[in-house]
Amino acid sequence: MSRIRFYFDHSLAGYFLRRAREKWFTRPPQRVNHHGVTLQVDCLPQEMQGILLAGRYECAEVALIPGFITAEDKVLEIGGAIGFLGLYCRKIAGVKEFVSVEPNPKTIAYLRSNYELNGIKPVLIEAALAAADGPVQLQISNLFWTDSLVSKADQSTGQPITVAGLSFASLVERAGLQFNTLIIDIEGGEKYIAFSDLPEAVTKMLIEIHPEIIGMEAYKVLETLIRSGFSVQGHSWNTWSLQREKAFRPRGQG
């Protein structure tokens, strides 16, 4: 009997049976510990589950945050997603004041659930960063990290929803926090930020740029930041950490 089982397991039929079992009967864990943060995964689409279970989610940011963002920093995060970076900063980096901005109602539900799992209450602004205040169309899909205000070449799997839009100045006012650090990942929406008008108190930035969505405008964002006194501290893929001296003023001013 064992010999028959051996030959069956190593046959083509045995291979397809194993694949069927893996697909239909093997359930992913309900939760995963990702770099010290507990995240709910069984509610997410299969592709997103796979990325989290493989430990590949937000790898660039995790590589750049240690030693860059500290417990003394006050952080405004634009693009809160499912709450991982906020929780990582709170739990691992020790940040005490952290405000997240996220427009997608479904993703907000994931964020709130993950914060609850980790015993932390989120401070959340439910809106999208936009060029001006008012309702905006957000393109969403099952993969929350593709949500964007910017039209893309391939929107075949997405759908538009109407969400509240706030200008950067309005977000700053709504946050009610004298933050010194910005975390930005908004799928091309970085082009809507007037980086040359950043509050002087902002001395640190962790930003993912998206040239695949907004083309050369993404690199103009970096150029504007450097002209505003920021210098590159590190980068991983399209994510950059930048820092400047406090109360920087461009040449010819002040």
Pin down the residues of each PLM region:
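Active-site segment flanking the S-adenosylmethionine/decSAM binding pocket
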Residues: K74-I82, P160-E217
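Short, hinge-like loop/turn segments at secondary-structure boundaries
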Residues: E116-N118, Q139-W145, E200-V202, E223-L225, ...
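Hydrophobic packing residues within well-ordered alpha-helices of enzyme cores
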Residues: C89, L111, L138, I193-A194
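S-adenosyl-L-methionine
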Residues: M1-N104, A109-S113, P211, A218-Y219, ...
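Glycine-rich adenosyl-binding loop in Rossmann-like folds that engage adenosine-containing cofactors
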Residues: P29, H35-V62, I125, A130-S170, ...
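A short acidic, amphipathic alpha-helical/loop segment
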Residues: L64, Y88, Y192-A201, K220-T224
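Short, conserved SAM-binding/catalytic segment
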Residues: L111-P122
